[in-house]
Design a protein with these regions (language model features):
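Carbohydrate transferase catalytic cores enriched for Leloir-type hexosyltransferases
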Residues: 1-320
Length: 320
């Protein structure tokens, strides 16, 4: 973990400085159109509390797409930079924008509720733009914390996860969880469930696919030091499209135990490949997949273990 943090610090130092100072004297005449902020724009050095009213005064309609408001509602789930930068960015958009869009009904309603709490009426236009999934997640070169790096349904993939060919080490099935490692994603409950099922059902593995996020030092240590890592427990820090599709399509069950989501794209990615899903009702997850996924409490590791093991023995359990 210390070496990883040092490497990340060196990468940040090597990044070129943002050209905001060089551009400070430049001006652009804009008197029409729409300015739309997307994704993690709160890291942009142009303060939206100044930019948005200036654009509005020039006749430009301003708009935003919210993916969630978790840094405001649950700051403990975010890193320090996001906790500091997101609230003023979000509140500026809520105060000045003529168009507010959410990636789910839940996210949109949360944004409108906060705007109303400012004493403001609803914007002139608001709506929802849902995400979509095709089973490929657009991720990079696969990396594992231990052992050789897998590269898909080829010899580099651990034999326990091979879906074709003969292998004495191949598991009977595996549960896959695709998400960044961060507190909100609740990997902890899956590890707790895994520790419950792994001894009595050694044929069922657990696969994590996701990069290291923030506030996860204890979780990463637990994964890296787990005695079953590399035999029944696997972690891919990244996966390219082919590897992702292979791992997800070959899974017995896809699990998403998040405390809350602004949408929940991995649920759609799994369902698109015909993989049963177990998830929660946190945030917008109740909107995703309708009544198809099995939904469990986010903190009940025994219920997760029982449901996942039961599906290994009864393939129709999560399909009915």
């Amino acid at each position: 973990p210390l070496l990883r943090r040092l490497n990340e610090a060196m990468r940040r130092r090597r990044r070129p400085p943002h050209p905001v100072d060089a551009h400070a004297g430049l001006t652009v005449s804009i008197d029409d159109g729409t300015f739309l902020d997307l994704d993690a724009a709160w890291h942009n050095p142009l303060d939206r509390r100044d930019l948005l009213p200036a654009l509005s005064a020039a006749g430009v309609r301003t708009a935003v797409l919210f993916h969630d408001l978790f840094p405001i509602d649950h700051p403990e789930w975010s890193d320090r930079g996001t906790r500091e930068l997101f609230p003023p960015w979000a509140d500026a958009h809520l105060r000045f924008d003529a168009l507010i869009v959410g990636n789910s009904d839940w996210t949109l309603q949360r944004a409108l509720d906060r705007r109303r709490g400012m004493g403001l009426p609803d914007p002139g236009v608001s709506g929802v733009v849902h995400l979509s999934g095709d089973g490929g997640a657009g991720r990079d070169e696969p990396v594992a914390p231990q052992g050789p790096t897998p590269t898909g349904a080829r010899p580099g993939l651990p034999p326990q996860l091979q879906t074709a060919g003969a292998s004495e080490r191949r598991l009977d099935g595996y549960v896959i969880c695709v998400s960044t490692l961060e507190p909100r994603k609740n990997h902890q409950v899956l590890l707790d469930a895994f520790d419950l099922w792994s001894q009595r059902t050694p044929g069922l593995g657990l696969v994590f696919v996701g990069r290291i996020g923030w506030n996860t030092e204890a979780l990463v240590r637990r994964i890296e030091r787990h005695p079953l890592l590399g035999s029944q427990l696997f972690w891919f820090a990244h996966a390219d499209d082919e590897t992702m599709r292979t791992l997800l399509g070959g899974a017995t069950v896809a699990a998403m135990p998040s405390h809350a989501e602004g949408f929940g794209l991995p649920v759609l990615e799994a369902l698109a490949l015909g993989v049963p899903v177990v998830t929660t009702n946190g945030g917008a997850l109740g909107e995703v997949g309708g009544d198809v996924p099995l939904r469990l409490a986010a903190d009940d590791s025994e219920a997760w273990a029982d449901a996942l093991v039961r599906h290994l023995a009864d393939e129709d359990y999560l399909r009915t």
